[in-house]
Regions:
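Alpha-helical segment of the N-proximal tetratricopeptide repeat
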Residues: 16-35, 46, 74-88
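Residue-level recognition of tetratricopeptide repeat
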Residues: 21, 49, 81-82, 115, ...
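Conserved structural position within tetratricopeptide repeats
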Residues: 34, 65-69, 98-101, 131-135, ...
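Short, charge-rich amphipathic alpha-helical segments embedded
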Residues: 37-56
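Start-of-helix register in tetratricopeptide repeats
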Residues: 42, 74, 108, 142, ...
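Canonical tetratricopeptide repeat
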Residues: 46, 78-79, 112, 146, ...
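Structural signature of tandem alpha-helical TPR/SEL1-like repeats
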Residues: 54-63, 85-98, 120-132, 154-166, ...
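Short coil turns that delineate tetratricopeptide repeat
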Residues: 70-72, 104, 138, 172
Length: 188
């Protein structure tokens, strides 16, 4: 029997429970938190994001802290999430960038980098990070959503429209649906 220290355990983002993402993309945030209990790190990350959307800051730090036993990249993603929740966009961006350098195949590391860079107003970095997250996990609607917002800030309206269309296709029950449809009418 082999004993592997927790700091060396690496869990792939591909091992995510698909129902957690589906619930997140439909705005069922309470159910996300329940479904992600004792789950994989990608689901735990989405639970933290759901708690942010619910403005339940007490649980956010706990969920991000749970990522720390899942390998170096997930630890950095968790630390970045904690920093972003504390409104430290610079530190959050640095930590997320390190996470992407540690595991270039983790779409949630790139998504976190996009969120942090957006908060810092670095739309070029945000757009590139969301595009990379989409390349790794094309079915993650919110990478398209925030990628569209970043593209819109850069006045790349065709790219924004493309991402918004993907978002609407992937998350037809999302709470942002009506707002996105209104934006789409102005882009056409």
């Amino acid at each position: 029997m082999w004993i592997v220290p927790a700091s060396l355990v690496v869990v792939s983002a591909a091992e995510q429970k698909p129902e957690v993402q589906r619930l997140f993309q439909s705005g069922s945030y309470e159910q996300v938190v329940e479904a992600a209990r004792d789950a994989d790190p990608a689901s735990t990350y989405l639970a933290a994001q759901a708690l942010l959307k619910l403005n339940r800051m007490d649980g956010v730090a706990a969920e991000f802290a749970r990522l720390k036993g899942n390998g170096p990249a997930w630890s950095l993603v968790g630390e970045s999430g904690e920093a972003l929740a504390a409104n430290d966009a610079g530190r959050a961006t640095d930590l997320a960038r390190k996470a992407t350098e540690t595991d270039g195949d983790n779409p949630f590391a790139f998504y976190q980098l996009g969120l942090a860079a957006s908060k810092a107003g670095d739309w070029g970095t945000a757009s590139a990070a969301f595009s990379h997250a989409i390349a790794l996990k094309a079915d993650f609607a919110y990478a398209h959503y925030y990628g569209a917002l970043a593209a819109q800030r850069q006045r790349q309206l065709p790219k924004a429209a493309e991402h918004f269309e993907a978002f609407l296709r992937l998350a037809p029950e999302a709470p942002e649906r009506q707002a996105v449809q209104a934006i789409m009418r102005t882009l056409k």
